[in-house]
Amino acid sequence: MMQWEKLYYVGAKAKQSGVMQGELAAELIHSDRRVNRNRDGKIQYVVLEGEPGHQDSIIRTENAVDTLKNNGIELEKLSYGVANWNRAQAQNRMMQMIGQHSNEIELVLANNDDMALGAIDAYAKLNITESAFPVFLGIDGTDAGLRAVMDAKLAGTVYNDKEGQAAAMAKLAVSLVSGSVPEDMEFENGRYIYLPYYKVTIANAEECLEKPGK
């Protein structure tokens, strides 16, 4: 980044997305005792991860789990599956985990919406009744993910403000061409612009889906 004075990074922090996913899960668990179906005082969960060793995947998972624990949720990890951010792979991995753990699974944390939707696909393919579904949570706020939240299939997601990032990149590019840097943009370490994630539930999913610039 320091090799060229006009090189900048615009994006979001993976840690924040994991923290917010954990907060969504904790809020739901505290507000709805039915999540803990076997009433053993702890939440049995599985994780669907992106590609092995990927920094965002590791950070999202660690921070989601740590946030749940910091909110007083006792956890038991049953399993995890690597699905490379892919819906079809997530369906296959989830079917394997259902085969191993059946109705023990109470929470599915997916590193992105596509994998969360793949997990839901697995339950549907196995003809498991929705009343026996665990809680599913994703990250990114894709159109498909937002629609699943609106349909109450996905309990929540964490919205990656790609429209805000695109606007920031366009504004920065125009300024750099004119030989200046916008004074109203916040930079970290001089070269990094981070746009915040935000939590999405059924209460605001439609608003996110209809966001200008999509």
Where in the sequence are the language-model features?
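Active-site-proximal beta-strand/loop segments in catalytic clefts of secreted hydrolases
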Residues: M1, A12-K13, L48-E51, Y80-N84, ...
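Loop/turn elements at helix/coil->beta-strand transitions in domains of secreted/extracellular proteins
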Residues: W4-K6, K42-Q44, N70-K77, S102-E106, ...
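Hydrophobic alpha-helical segments within soluble ligand-binding/sensing domains
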Residues: V10-K42, A90-Q91, G141-G145, D161-S180
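Extracytoplasmic ligand-binding site segments that recognize negatively charged/polar headgroups
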Residues: A12-G22, I43-T67, E76, A83, ...
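Sec-exported extracytoplasmic/periplasmic mature domains
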Residues: E23-S31, V65, K69-I73, M95-N103, ...
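Hinge/cleft segment of the Venus flytrap/periplasmic-binding protein
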Residues: K42-P52, D56, T67, G164-K214
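Hydrophobic alpha-helical
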Residues: N63-A64, E76-A148
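Exported/periplasmic ABC-transporter solute-binding proteins
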Residues: D121-E163, A167, K171-F187, Y194
